[in-house]
């Protein structure tokens, strides 16, 4: 069941990534609040999606990150918090503190960091090309 949910999360992430090239933002200015809102929604989708991937794998016995030593307990809520923290630090390229990826989690973190780097470039490129076509 958990692996089926992992597949659903991966499909949603891929759908979100491909929507960048298909969804048109109607804006009257080069950079608008609509463009910013799309960027924020996309980052939140990626952050939550990758956090779910980390958590599902961790719950199923695949060590993908080192849990925070500051966690009072090792329940699922603490695991969710650590997964969200790891995902946010990776996606926004802030850097790691007490939670770091290990094993296959390192490869997932590389993919997430790449997505985090490419996203602003895609938004700027789409904005420029859309503006030129008007």
UniProtKB/Swiss-Prot annotation:
Gene3D superfamilies: 1.10.287.70. Pfam families: Ion_trans_2. SUPFAM superfamilies: Voltage-gated potassium channels. It comes from the Bacteria. InterPro entries: K_chnl_dom. This is Protein LctB. It comes from Bacillus caldotenax.
